[in-house]
Structures are given as structure tokens and as C-alpha cells.
Regions:
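Translation machinery proteins
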Residues: 16-70, 92
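Short, surface-exposed beta-strand/loop "edge" segments at domain boundaries and coil↔beta transitions
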Residues: 70-71, 171
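Conserved small/polar residues in nucleotide/adenosyl-binding loops
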Residues: 200-202
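Glycine-rich phosphate-binding loops that contact phosphosugars or nucleotide phosphates
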Residues: 73-78
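OB-fold/S1-family RNA-binding modules
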Residues: 1
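C-terminal functional extensions of proteins
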Residues: 191, 195-198
Length: 202
């Protein structure tokens, strides 16, 4: 288990050793694994909600039509794509890739999921961005809030992973809380938990 107080010290040292810059830097967390066989299908594909808000929330695209599409727009989703737009995108692979790479997370009306899978599944799947289904009566605002404060963590064929846990102007304790949330979530996916964790670098 990762000790949060130790993470605070690691973050302090990282900030002190870094040169002053005129722009806000993202704070990245790197985890290195050991004693796992990447050739036997070891992979991580996790979404982790950070407990402390960052100044740069994740971008969320919602695929929905009708009432849910209107609710998504009213909730100020970063992008709302209806069924007609999905069909247009599926005919333009270059435009589809650009759109998919632009957003961190995708949500979709449960009724649209089969269409999304058929039209864009081959592009969304390999990128780990298949939409999370949203039931018709679900509170869109709650879904948006959860995913905007989340990070996507992927590792395939590699003994390391990295993700953004915040920005340097955040407090050390807040950054440590986010780092701890990520570490705890990833440990649960490892065959032997923390024993498979070799290094944490921030």
C-alpha cells in the first residue's frame, strides 16, 4: 500500500528540483511494475476518479439524440454528437480519428450503444475509449462531473504507465491524494498488488 505522507514528500522534492517556468506545468505520475509477464496478456485499462479537483478537467463527449442530447448540451458537455452526426463521422475515418483523439472520455445513450459500436467501434475500442452507457433517466450532470475529474490509465505490453494527477499550482496534499487514488486503483489490478510495484516517480 502506498503511503500518502511519503507521496507528499516525493511531490515536494519534485517541485523543489524543478526549474521555475512561466507557465503551469502538469504533474505526471509514473508507475513501474515488476514480476509481471507482459507477454501473457498483462494489461491495464482503468478509469480512476481523482478525489481533488484539477484546474484542467478531462474533456467529455456525449453521444445522444433527442431529450438526452438536449440535456447533455444544457449540462455543457464538451461535445454532443447525435445519431445523424455519428453516421457522417463513420463515413470519414480521418475526421473520426481526429474527433476521438480530441476527447478524454465518451458517454453514450444506452439506446445508441449498438450504433456507436457499429459506426465507430473499430476506432474507439483500440484506443480504450468505448463510451460508458448512460441510462435515459440518469442525471447527466453527475456523469459529467465524475468523468471530468477522472483520468484514463492504460498499459499494454509495457511495464510502466503514466497519467496526469494535477498541476503544479495545486497543494502538495491534494496532489498526493490524487496520486494515492491512482496507485490504490492500479494496485488492485496487479496480480500480487503492491508487490508488483517497483517504482513511483512524480
Amino acid at each position: 500500500m502506498v503511503n500518502e505522507s511519503q507521496l507528499v514528500e516525493v511531490i515536494k522534492q519534485a517541485k523543489e528540483s524543478d526549474k521555475d517556468r512561466k507557465f503551469k506545468q502538469s504533474v505526471e505520475m509514473i508507475m513501474v511494475f515488476k514480476d509481471v509477464d507482459v507477454k501473457k496478456g498483462f494489461a491495464i485499462n482503468e478509469t480512476v476518479q481523482l478525489p481533488k479537483k484539477t484546474t484542467k478537467p478531462a474533456s467529455v463527449c456525449i453521444m445522444a439524440s433527442g431529450d438526452m442530447g438536449i440535456k447533455a448540451k444544457n449540462a455543457k458537455a464538451d461535445m454532443v454528437i447525435d445519431e445523424n452526426e455519428l453516421t457522417k463521422l463513420s463515413a470519414d475515418k480521418k475526421k473520426s480519428k481526429k474527433m476521438i483523439n480530441k476527447y478524454d472520455f465518451f458517454l453514450a445513450d444506452t439506446k445508441l450503444m449498438p450504433t456507436v459500436g457499429k459506426k465507430l467501434g473499430q476506432l474507439l475500442g483500440p484506443r480504450g475509449k468505448m463510451p460508458t452507457p448512460v441510462p435515459f433517466n440518469a442525471p447527466i450532470e453527475s456523469f459529467l462531473e465524475r468523468f471530468r475529474s477522472s483520468v484514463k490509465i492504460r498499459a499494454k505490453g509495457s511495464l510502466s504507465m503514466s497519467c496526469r494527477i494535477g498541476e503544479e499550482n495545486m497543494g502538495d496534499a491534494d496532489l498526493a491524494a490524487n496520486a494515492s487514488a491512482v496507485a490504490t486503483a492500479i494496485e488492485k489490478t496487479l496480480p500480487n498488488g503492491s508487490k508488483n510495484l517497483s517504482l513511483i516517480h512524480i
